[in-house]
Amino acid sequence: MFCYMKIKDIVNRDLVNLTNCESEPIHIPGSIQPNGFLLGLDAGTYTITYCSQNTTDFIRLSPEVMLGKSLADIFDQEQYDHFVSYADVADIDPARPFVFILDDIPYNTTVHTSGATLVLEFEPFPDGAIGLPDLYAQTRNFVSLMEKHSHLLDLCKDIAGEMRKITGYDRVMIYKFDADYNGEVIAESKRDDLNSFAGQKYPHTDIPAQARQLYVRNQLRVIADVDYIPVPLLTRGDENTDNRSLDLSLSVLRSVSPIHLQYLRNMGVCATLTISLLQKNTLWGLITCHHYTPKILPHYTRLSALLQGHFLTSQIAVREVAEEFEVGQDVEKALSNSLSLLHQNENFIEDMWDEPSLLKIANATGFVIYYKGKIYQSGNVPEQEDLLPLLKTLSEKYPSEGLHTDRLLDVYENGEKVAKYAAGIVYHSITAGTSDGILWLRKERRETINWAGNPHKAVLVNEAGETRLSPRKSFELWMEEVKNKSVAWRKVELHAAASFAYALQKHINLRYVRNQEQRSRILNEELKAANKEL
């Protein structure tokens, strides 16, 4: 007797119709890219519960035939047994895919778990050949680059070139994110006929928060053709089937946000590869590859590219610490010299306030000590009539915790005159309950930021007054001049400034105690003299 099985797709219609990329549920599209096919298995029974609609583009079995069957019913016993052995581990290594042979064609099969589902993604090898990269040569090249460069930016430039050699993309860029997730292209390798994007910034709205979270979870994403037609995922639609959406966060073939695809089309890009650069499980930056025609990248080439990303990730913290250490050596030397003078001189504030090492403690352009109603200053500082209100405000707002900022006007509204000399400050109180304080100042550094398009036009407001993010249409260079901002303070500079401020507090307290003791001795001697006279 013929039994009709009801089948339904799990395409996320909200995703397809969405106009606001900030709200996109991009991890559950319910569809994949068409350069492979997908099976979802019950992890306990290996029953096929999900199947992409395009299986007959690759093999002779349709979704109607496979859904509800065991994997053992579909593949020969030897391959099934090998796969069970491969998948029966606590953590499946995605870098070590399984190779299925179907109709005499080898398929690279990446496997991962998604809840209670085992997700298998099948991709035919290019030209039917399993081409393995020369990972030894690539590793050797990276080690050579690592030894060649001491600074991170120089290393990134060569890594971009190496990545382009490995993958064959038209353009490779390395982005670094700032604290607000605006991305800057810090290194680039490209075809000679292409315009350079090096030094350009892209607003944080280009990569919404949920996309950044996916980049942390899945460190590689590939798009073979931005004009692809999404392939729906199918599942059984009878009453006894749990038809929840399938989380494809870790998928290679996962269908991409239609808004992101339009964004790429607006750039003229046809295919991409993106690799995450993480530091302490936070997105530090991206390696982004662009191609201007469709491009399918084989798994093992993707693996090589990902390996380069891991290499670079391993060096980011090392190089940043090394560069910080270079600055730190000079700062520590200045701090040591200042502390030595402080301990040797009872009247340090009055006698040594213009010592050059005090500026060098924080690489400042101006330095101020305000003590007992008097200002001691060196370097470039504001007029005293402008400085006194600032010191009063700081002592009231930050009596104990201190303050550092590279944009004074954000914390001091009436500081236009001061900002000319002190766009950035580090402040510490030195005497409790008074306006006494110590201040390092940094002058303004005007900067022109080259945005790839107007960053403010990435956010649109509709007729209902709702804020929406949409794919930008223009990437024409848009220059923004940044004023009233200093170079950011480094951690080592802030630590040195705090250490000296603490030492100065102790010095003042100790001097107060000594003065009190001296006054007591004088008073006692005067009393003794008076008693003798009596």
Which role does the model predict for each range below?
Residues 82, 131, 300, 316-333, ...:
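Short alpha-helical interdomain "coupling" segment at the junction between an upstream regulatory sensor module
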Residues 138, 297-317, 489-503, 522:
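Amphipathic alpha-helical "output/dimerization" segments
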Residues 291-297:
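A generic structural motif
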Residues 311-314, 318, 364, 396, ...:
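Short, well-ordered loop/turn and helix-capping segments at boundaries between secondary-structure elements
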Residues 484, 491, 495, 499, ...:
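Amphipathic alpha-helical coiled-coil "transmission" helices that mediate dimerization
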